């Protein structure tokens, strides 16, 4: 069978790598793909890049090539309604409809949904007037969190530790319109403390299948300093998610979300990612929903998945996820992101990457912002690669990842040296 995967990031390289391992699969087409999927030789099935991004063109390709299943990686095509287009063309696709994807594409929709269905989350208020937002911040004080309502590629959240920072964030979004439509409304919410974890599940409309837990590192610099990024590294499993917290997350967050979407007449199918804040006494609050797998969490999660992903996704599309169990590698997987010069601001592109090691049983390199140019792999985006190490402990996995990184070189390469530190006591 043939599979179509939408996207071009590290998450998509990891998904393509896993999908191509299925004995059922002949070709995985990645649209548009990256330098890693362009040079993927490590799997039994072929992985091919497809230079198409238009939704109808992708649907036409899927029809013409008799694609068995389409899997959507990033949020933008979901918010644009790719699932609706494919379903209207009678095609099998895994992901939420445009309406259901509002759980991620509108923070206001998501918060109102949680409030309506009793899902634990931070107190909040939504504003489109800068004047009213400033008054609210003055009344509430800092620290406080300012979020753009719409999709802002991971750059729409400001955790303001001071009033000045909070007011500046409101001005940036509402007054100066720096994020365009995404920042035309802002959600302002209370600051939560605790440990964050990423809880990612497959949903078939009614049934849920949990993937391995993970924890990521959002800040650019060691010791969680510097600006927020899309994520500088992640590891799986997340020790903070104990069996009790796992059960609680399913009971208090995931199942009420799936049932709530059904009750609201917009049943949810697809990956569902709940960003959770776990307080020291084990209480959970939902920070955000994403309608996709996290990046870089996908890379260590896929590195640990032993089961056939195609089989699980087929069951999800058919509404029979209750018949599936997943098997996981007992080892810890830890991924470290290598970023381009000047990231998270406008990154430099075109730097030649050398020394990429061959994948082994315990070291895997997933590409993100790379492309193939004149036979060489060069940087083409902010987060360039994610290097994953596997070992029996977090420390061991960390050592494997950094050992592999020691061979890789490109001008301006930046990465954190402490990924996983929270789990290494």
Regions found by a protein language model. Name each.
Residues 4-5, 103-185, 215, 239-255:
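Active-site nucleotide/adenylate-binding loops and adjacent lid/helix of ATP-dependent enzymes
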Residues 21-23, 38-39, 94, 116-118, ...:
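Solvent-exposed alpha-helices and their adjacent loops that cap or buttress functional pockets
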Residues 250-272, 290-362, 372-373:
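Active-site "cap" helix and flanking loop/linker of ATP-utilizing ligase/carboxylase catalytic domains
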Residues 165-168, 344-347, 392-399:
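Short, conserved charged micro-motifs
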Residues 370-374, 379-425:
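Generic C-terminus detector
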Residues 1-98:
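ATP-binding N-terminal substructure of ATP-dependent carboxylate-amine bond-forming enzymes
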